[in-house]
Amino acid sequence: SGAAMAQSSVTLFGIVDTAVGYVDNANAAGDSVYGLSTSGNATSRLGFRGVEDLGGGLTAGFHLEGEIFGDDGNTAGFNFQRRSTVSLMGGFGEVRMGRELTPSYSKTSSYDLFGQTGIGQFMGWRDWASNSDFGAANTTSVPTADASNVRASNMISYYTPNFSGFTAGLGYGFDEQTTGKAGRYVGGYVAYDNGPLSLAASYDQRDLVLNVGVPVVGSAVLDRDTFTLGGSYDLNVVKLNAIVQQSKYKALGESEKVNAYALGVSAPVGAGEVKLQYAMYDQKAIDSKAHHISLGYVHNLSKRTAVYGTVSYMDNKDDSNLGLQAKNLSTGGPGRGESQTGVQVGVRHSF
């Protein structure tokens, strides 16, 4: 009916982001690669969202969102694994159920100047256990986005109203296992936003299974605890951002840590923004560090369209072999202790 239509709405939305990219030392052999990559400034996506006014200050909503690849049109079998939630909202805050970003990540990742996309992004939420921390032959039992505490399935989350600048979010992801608790997630954040100042602290715990060796010769319970502090201060002329993070793994009878830090500064320039960010990743298990510096510029052509460019340099020390994240460009980690430089120039359009 007309009344029903007036009380509810459904929106189709998306982003297409494609860039020309180049990365040197793209593998251990020292080869370079260039071509098109996707999601250099924002993740390309397609989704549907809607709300219904239930009256009495209560609103129902849904959000379905999947990733697309702007460079080749592939979707890897389109699904809604970026987000698939149903929610109830009111004066009490918001309750959501389904799969989405964990509450803690959704808040503290906002202090990354490069928005967790492209070669400039802060890499603290990397799935470290499947890479260097417990040996390159190891893999975890869930997708990377889940093992790194970025997203969780089967999750109930709650977001509070704003209390004079203070907000909080909590999430619990069920493991849905008859035995053990692999896949269980619990985490949350508290934040304070007031004018130019923004501060947040978050904690996550993810229960996994670590598959040991190639071929798999055994498995072990793996817990990842991540504690993150983030903040920003807007001075109008420039804005300062910072992240301090520790990821602690408990597996194989040992405890290993990865300490990650980021410090960034951004400044408006005409219709665009210049941003500079330095990050350091201290990988305790292999007693190695990596230094990561990125410079970017985004120029807004309209409210929905922008062009951008990013230059990023990863300086690996000792046994570290972290690689820049140029999605859909065939890159990996360089040789251990080898550096890597990347460039992305692209267009982002939202609808």
Task: Name the predicted role of every residue range.
Residues 8-14, 52, 56-60, 91-95, ...:
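Outer-envelope beta-barrel architecture signal
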Residues 2-6:
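Sec/Tat signal peptide C-region and signal peptidase I cleavage site
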Residues 13-21, 63-65, 98-100, 169-173, ...:
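Transmembrane beta-strands of outer-membrane beta-barrel proteins
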Residues 335-351:
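Outer-membrane beta-barrel "beta-signal"
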Residues 187-300, 310-313:
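Detector for outer-membrane/organellar transmembrane beta-barrel domains
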Residues 19-23, 67-71, 102-106, 175-177, ...:
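Structural signature of outer-membrane beta-barrel domains
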Residues 7-22, 33-175, 182-184, 191-198:
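Outer membrane beta-barrel
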